[in-house]
Amino acid sequence: MSFNIMHTPADLDAALDASQERPIVIFKHSATCPFSAMAQLEVANAKHDIDIYGIVLQYAGDLSKQIAERLDVEHASPQAIVVSRGKALGHYWRSQIKEQKLKEEVAANA
């Protein structure tokens, strides 16, 4: 599996295209937030089993808004969104972001 950094709308398109084949996780986080640092550890541990597409909010704020709009989820940070077939199946923020929870939701929708 992989960890991919998104910067552009084309990167988001590629992530949503990838979700047509198998569920993915979109991970949005801040480079300066302690909650983001904890969530990033959980997501990093899951990267061996899940394709993850991440953005750093300080560098991709507009892309974060597009993700919220296109997936019809409220913006949060940090936030992990499980996506399958271009649709959000679930989204988690702050302390809700747990490696096992992400793996279980992805496996249930594979």
Locate the predicted segments by residue.
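Short cysteine/histidine-rich metal-coordination sites, predominantly Zn2+-binding motifs
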Residues: K47-Y53, K101-K103
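Thiol-based oxidoreductase modules, predominantly thioredoxin-like and allied folds used
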Residues: M6, K28, I50-Q66
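Local sequence-structure signature of Cys/Sec-based thiol-disulfide redox active-site neighborhoods
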Residues: A14-A46
